[in-house]
């Protein structure tokens, strides 16, 4: 063996193996505390923040500590307690889509607002969601695990829970502020009284084609007596009547926002809105009727704090109901009507009841005409801004001098009643919203 070969062999023997190098010699971040490393990771751009979990197991755990909001798709991940271990600091959790039995071989994805799931092509029952929901006992077990480990939970969305699951949640998560309950019923609401600090609540009773559940005056009364600190409330697919709505108005004294969606309430419920002393915003959407028989006019008192009335995708050919609604909300400064059918000139004339409207938005109101619009807004002395979009029966050629004079005084105007409107193009550069200067020309009006 030559001297050179001996030298090479000795060098190899003395060489330190790669796997014997201490981690501290190649990973300088090991000297940093978790809290300091978390602060460094938080400084990374949003596009790179998720990639840090690929570096090593420690960084994976740190990234899990940073996560605050999560939408779960696999309920077993919660039942195995891996969710709370992997993400210990969650404050916002959405369990709705995880509460369904998965269809492994289905390529059909059904979506309805916040719910999405795979649907079998041979399903013959239109209540397919109800038959594929996890049992309430399983849901409750998951809620117990979540509440036991997630003390900082602020917002939760869940479907098909029971009173027991809600009670365990309220007992451990005392800071819970927002709750969304799908497939809600009266029994479930019996346990909601334990959620003393709730500020926002969304109840979904029945959804056509998906599931059936009943929220009546009994459940609304439980809600009213238990959740007195509510600021925002949405009732979707709920039943009830004057008594249930009145109880909420009397007990929830700081309620500022009320949303009614696809209601199944008995006639006369609108009069109960008079009991809401702090209500500022009323939203009504996707309703087939407003209130066919609102009762005696003497019961219809104004909501003293009302600021905004918003109607979306509703049938407004119920004249008595519209009259009662406008009467109760006559102090609103903002009126927004979008994609509602049946809003005729006769029906819109009832809007003269509003006393101090400053902003009006009309979109997708295809029956309302220029004359019907004019007959109302000329009565509103405080009107400052207006938006008219996709209202095909409102024509530029039908604008009167009185209406054009009003337009010239508005601070803000969006005018696109249809795609053929010439007036919309003439508004550009007219100074609307800056000086309130007149922008109409004779050629526009004729």
Swiss-Prot record:
Gene3D superfamilies noted in UniProt: Ribonuclease Inhibitor
Source taxon at top rank: Eukaryota
F-box domain location: 27-73
UniProt protein name: F-box protein At5g51370
